[in-house]
Swiss-Prot record:
Residues 703-853 are cytoplasmic. Residues 718-740 are annotated as: Disordered. A motif (Di-leucine internalization motif) lies at residues 852-853. It comes from Human immunodeficiency virus type 1 group M subtype B (strain 89.6) (HIV-1). This is Envelope glycoprotein gp160. The lineage of its organism: Viruses, Riboviria, Pararnavirae, Artverviricota, Revtraviricetes. The chain crosses the membrane at residues 682-702. The record marks R508, A509 as: Cleavage. Disulfide bonds join C53-C73, C118-C207, C125-C198, C130-C158, C220-C249, C230-C241, C298-C332, C378-C441, C385-C414, C595-C601. Residues 571-589 are annotated as: Immunosuppression. Glycans are attached at residues 87, 129, 134, 138, 157, 189, 199, 232, 236, 243, 264, 278, 291, 297, 303, 333, 340, 356, 362, 392, 396, 402, 444, 456, 608, 613, 622, 634. Keywords: AIDS, Apoptosis, Clathrin-mediated endocytosis of virus by host, Cleavage on pair of basic residues, Coiled coil, Disulfide bond, Fusion of virus membrane with host endosomal membrane, Fusion of virus membrane with host membrane, Glycoprotein, Host cell membrane, Host endosome, Host membrane, Host-virus interaction, Lipoprotein, Membrane, Palmitate, Signal, Transmembrane, Transmembrane helix, Viral attachment to host cell, Viral envelope protein, Viral immunoevasion, Viral penetration into host cytoplasm, Virion, Virus endocytosis by host, Virus entry into host cell.
Length: 853
């Protein structure tokens, strides 16, 4: 019968086994993955940070103070490392690059700092009596030419009155000024002038030893950041770049301050490259980068001499005294063939943006001298050159050109200004002291700044381009177009099949994530409650440290004029703090997750497919770290929070397990150290009871002696007297005995302990009650005595105040009487003296009468 039942149920049993096997196979196929932390992954994000400088300052003259303060920069790396990032495409945008703004602010600060200790020329804002300097052509010099002669009135010989080293004394002095540096005063006959910027700016004279020679500056990123460089040879400045490398510093950038023409910059590696934020917007500047430089040689033939004028105590003004030799105009020379070839290549590139158009170059449409002319610094003097000959040509579609032809050399007439409107900000001007001797300099034109005339491009077939400039950001942008700063994110999370071995305990109802207190919010909590917020406190403590460092840096920046710190010094401090902040933040996160000192750290947090449903093999075999970070970017903070909760729960579990391990084995109860502790506790209890018995025995003896009894045995039961009306009887007598006054005779440890404890409580009660009564009595007595003393002192005060009043009245009366009596006596004496004087003639007459008689 049993065999038949087994055969009957075999079909159901076989189906159940098959279903169980399928479930096991499905569960095995759907393997679980866990979050794994990786430290040092190649991941970055766009960021802005403080850059610091590196320079080969030692390779230049150390006696001359360079305005760029490159002596405060760190030395350049002799072997710079550049790592090419293969299979990486990164977006660059030269028009929205924080590096450009940062360099612009740095150059402004460096100019301001270099002029801080220099002399203010406010005393020179006086009336100048000027005449034209006589210009005579030296015919014996064969090199002189008509074009080179300076125009009449280009140099003014001005006399003026200035304060000497003694403030209340004034003397007359003279100096030579350029026509561009002075303006005539209204309603005069062109003989009275003033300095050009006196009505709008504060003029500061550049210190005599300040040099404006551009020294290459390398911008570097602090630790924790990287600089990406685009190596595409035809990169237009914005958009994706496929040839990317990472560097720590830029190439050497010369901070050349110039307009219209870019000097001594970097060249394009292949064809000429033109860059603009928007070619269809004529308000946007077009930056042209040449692939071959054009040499420009500039000369100031005049041999100037200068003199030192005292304009007050401790202040000196350096003026031009005289011009020796030919007074010829400063000029620059450019090869016409090279310049035309350069323009032809520029036209080819412009036609790619403006198809079927005639390209015309024309001179500047007007504005400040810095914009209208090509301004730059040559040997310490600021040249302003007329570039009309450079930009005066038309290039038609067929390739022909209509321009000014001439000899092989293009000569640009230049003027020199000594009072320069500072390009950094309005309201500041600088006076460049004259340079003695002749000046020559040679520069390389590596780029142009162009602007396009407006208008509807469909109505005209000609696009007119003019030289531009003035915004020095375009100068820096022409060098920094290939760089961008990124923040390295070395911590990455990804799913793996490995799980961290953990201590398994039942989860509590309240999670750690529900407790978010401030850094000091748990100060009043219990130790157990405060330990829950240790992670939050660690994070807030780090942000507090960083905030403190930032506050210190702001304080240093506010006092840099007292500490004599340059801009580069501030940036180096900031770079070091940023590096420390980055390192501490990463190490803090790794420590919070229990991964300190590890590069690969497994966790017990399961991977959720909602974060990314890609398989582990697909992730690790087909994706880069940058692609993976973009995939899970929205869930990174949530994963970090889960890792923190998991590690906190793990630490709690380990703590509770360690607490249970102390009682895991009963054998620990019989450990010799525990027994010694038990014995010590027993001895302390017994000793305390014995001491208590001794104290009560002494107190009982003292109490009995005070009552007239002899100190008998502590436990002997003594009968009490019956009183005078009840005589003692015998044991055989009947009747009830009176109660005894002594305590009962007890046996045993617990009974003795109870009696002693009861007696102690009664003793303390009576003692405290008596003490309270005594204190109450003392307070009452002191209150009564105090009130009586107060009344006594009050009566005494009233008595003595009345006595003092009476004494004062008596004293005043006596004084008045004495004064009155004294006054009467004085009056009588005066009267007697007057009578005596009045009676003198009478006495004389009487004496004469007696003598005659």
């Amino acid at each position: 019968m049993r065999v038949k039942e087994i055969r009957k149920n075999w079909q159901h049993l076989r189906g159940g086994i098959l279903l169980l096997g399928m479930l096991m196979i499905c569960s095995a196929a759907k393997e679980k993955t866990w979050v794994t932390i990786y430290y040092g992954v190649p991941v970055w994000r766009e960021a802005t940070t403080t850059l610091f400088c590196a320079s080969d300052a030692k390779a230049y003259d150390t006696e001359v103070h360079n305005v760029w303060a490159t002596h405060a920069c760190v030395p350049t790396d002799p072997n710079p490392q550049e790592v090419v990032l293969g299979n990486v495409t990164e977006n660059f945008n030269m028009w929205k690059n924080n590096m450009v703004d940062q360099m612009h602010e740095d150059i402004i600060s460096l100019w301001d700092e270099s002029l801080k200790p220099c002399v203010k020329l406010t005393p020179l804002c006086v009336t100048l009596n000027c005449t034209n300097l006589n210009i005579t052509k030296n015919t014996t010099n064969p090199t002189s030419s008509s074009w080179g002669m300076m125009e009449k009135g280009e140099i003014k010989n001005c006399s003026f009155y200035i304060t000497t080293s003694i403030r209340n004394k004034v003397k007359k002095e003279y100096a030579l000024f350029n026509r561009l540096d002075v303006v005539p005063i209204e309603n005069t006959n062109n003989t009275k002038y003033r300095l050009i910027s006196c009505n709008t700016s504060v003029i500061t004279q550049a210190c005599p030893k300040v040099s404006f020679q551009p020294i290459p500056i390398h911008y570097c990123v602090p630790a924790g950041f990287a600089m990406l460089k685009c190596n595409n040879k035809t990169f237009n400045g914005s958009g994706p770049c496929t040839n990317v490398s990472t560097v720590q510093c830029t190439h050497g950038i010369r901070p050349v301050v110039s307009t219209q023409l870019l000097l001594n910059g970097s060249l394009a590696e292949e064809d000429i490259v033109i860059r603009s934020e928007n070619f269809t917007d004529n308000a946007k500047t077009i930056i042209v980068q040449l692939n071959e430089s054009v040499v420009i040689n500039c000369t100031r033939p005049n041999n100037n001499t200068r003199r030192r004028l005292s304009i007050g105590p401790g202040r000196a003004f350096y003026a031009r005294r005289n011009i020796i030799g030919d007074i010829r105009q400063a000029h620059c020379n450019i090869s016409r063939a090279k310049w035309n070839n350069t323009l032809q290549q520029i036209v080819i590139k412009l036609r790619e943006k403006f198809r079927n158009k005639t390209i015309a170059f024309n001179q500047s449409s007007g504005g400040d001298p810095e914009i209208v002319m090509h301004s730059f610094n040559c040997g310490g003097e600021f040249f302003y050159c007329n570039t009309a000959q450079l930009f005066n040509s038309t290039w038609n579609v067929t390739g022909g050109t209509n321009g000014t032809e001439g000899n092989d050399i293009i000569t640009l007439q230049c003027r020199i200004k000594q009072i320069i409107n500072m390009w950094q900000k309005v309201g500041k001007a600088m006076y460049a002291p004259p340079i003695t001797g002749q000046i020559r300099c040679s520069s390389n034109i590596t780029g142009l700044l162009l602007t396009r005339d407006g208008g509807n491009s469909t109505e005209t077939e000609t696009e007119i381009f003019r030289p531009g400039g003035g915004d020095m950001r375009d100068n820096w942008r022409s060098e920094l177009y290939k760089y961008k700063v990124v923040r390295i994110e070395p911590i990455g999370v990804a799913p793996t099949r490995a799980k961290r071995r953990t201590v398994q305990r039942e989860k509590r109802a309240v999670g750690i994530g529900a407790v978010f207190l401030g850094f000091l919010g748990a100060a009043g909590s219990t130790m157990g409650a405060a330990s829950v917020t240790l992670t939050v406190q660690a994070r807030l403590l780090l942000s507090g440290i960083v905030q403190q460092q930032n506050n210190l840096l702001r304080a240093i920046e506010a006092q840099q004029h007292m500490l004599q710190l340059t801009v580069w010094g501030i940036k180096q401090l900031q770079a070091r703090v940023l590096a420390l902040e980055r390192y501490l933040r990463d190490q803090q996160l790794m420590g919070i997750w229990g991964c300190s000192g590890k590069l690969i750290c497994t966790t017990s947090v399961p991977w959720n497919v909602s974060w990314s449903n890609k398989s582990v093999d697909d992730i690790w075999n087909n994706m880069t770290w940058m692609e993976w970070e973009r995939e899970i970017d929205n869930y990174t903070d949530y994963i970090y929070d889960l890792l923190e909760k998991s590690q906190t729960q793990q630490e709690k579990n380990e703590k509770e397990l360690l607490e249970l391990d102390k009682w895991a084995s009963l054998w620990n109860w019989f450990d010799i150290t525990n027994w010694l502790w038990y014995i010590r506790l027993f001895i302390m209890i017994v000793g305390g009871l014995i001491g208590l018995r001794i104290v009560f025995a002494v107190l009982s003896i003292v109490n009995r002696v005070r009552q007239g009894y002899s100190p008998l045995s502590f436990q002997t039961l003594l009968p009490a007297s019956r009183g005078p009306d009840r005589p003692e009887g015998t044991e055989e007598e009947g009747g009830e005995r009176d109660r005894d006054r002594s305590g009962p005779l007890v046996n045993g440890f617990l009974a003795l302990f109870w009696v002693d404890l009861r007696n102690l409580c009664l003793f303390l009660y009576h003692l405290l009650r008596n003490l309270l009564l005594i204190v109450t009595r003392i307070v009452e007595l002191l209150g009564r005595r105090g009130w009586e003393a107060l009344k006594y002192w009050w009566n005494l005060l009233q008595y003595w105040s009345q006595e003092l009043k009476n004494s004062a009245v008596s004293l005043l009366n006596a004084t008045a009487i004495a004064v009155a009596e004294g006054t009467d006596r004085v009056i009588k004496i005066v009267q007697r003296a007057c009578r005596a004087i009045r009676n003198i003639p009478t006495r004389i007459r009487q004496g004469l009468e007696r003598a005659l008689l």
